[in-house]
């Protein structure tokens, strides 16, 4: 069984990592590389979502979409955006 994360709970987890900077955190390492690096990760994952949608299983597609959401939220944390900032534009 896995623990279900929501958009909000993932954001809170990433924000906490950014604030507490646990040693060995991949999220912290990515944040330290800056927006350019994070933007490249979003582009990479968006391409993988497209490829998965064309050629892979639903399970693989779901995994790629989750990675795109993760990297998008890391950018949100880096820029100081909150989920509410996104929700008002949906």
UniProtKB/Swiss-Prot annotation:
Give GO terms: molecular function aspect only. ATP binding; phosphoribosyl-ATP diphosphatase activity
One Pfam family name is: PRA-PH
> Does the UniProt entry include the keyword Ligase?
no
Cell compartment(s), UniProt: Cytoplasm
Q: Does the keyword Hydrolase apply?
A: yes
* Family, as annotated: Belongs to the PRA-PH family.
**What's this protein's name?**
Phosphoribosyl-ATP pyrophosphatase
């Amino acid at each position: 069984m896995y623990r279900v994360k929501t958009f909000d709970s993932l954001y809170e987890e990433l924000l906490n990592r950014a604030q507490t900077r646990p040693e060995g955190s991949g999220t912290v390492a990515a944040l330290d590389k800056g927006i350019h690096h994070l933007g490249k990760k979003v582009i990479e994952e968006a391409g993988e979502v497209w490829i998965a949608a064309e050629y892979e299983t639903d399970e693989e597609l779901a995994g790629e979409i989750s990675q795109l959401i993760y990297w998008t939220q890391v950018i949100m944390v880096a820029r100081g955006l909150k989920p509410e900032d996104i929700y008002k534009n949906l």
